[in-house]
Amino acid sequence: MNRIEKIREYVDNVLLHMSDETERRCGYLHLYGVSQACALIALKRRENVELATIAGMLHDIYFYLTMDTKDHAHRGSVIAREILTSLQSFAGDEIDMICTAIHNHSSKGRKHSSFDEVLIDCRCFATLFI
């Protein structure tokens, strides 16, 4: 199983166990919508498409696990690090890239790395349509 599929399996498991059907549906649309946008923008900007796709899938995982928005970007980066480490499929620098992007995805007012900006831009873009 490739790495994106491993993450998709984890995300699907989280969403399938949500009791609120509307929130579950929104979760699928939002997480996978942002993920697809990340893949396209990363390709255009010559960033790592696979890691951007994964960052998009995991960027709001804390919210969908807890239904709590407080400090969700920071807390989500901690959970994402645990998930990625437990899969034993990612190098440390890849985990750092993904988790830093997740940590920064709600910080629209500051300049971040070009990789982080992919997730920030896609998340903003997705909120217009999803």
Predicted segments with their positions:
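Metal-dependent phosphohydrolase cores
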Residues: 1-130
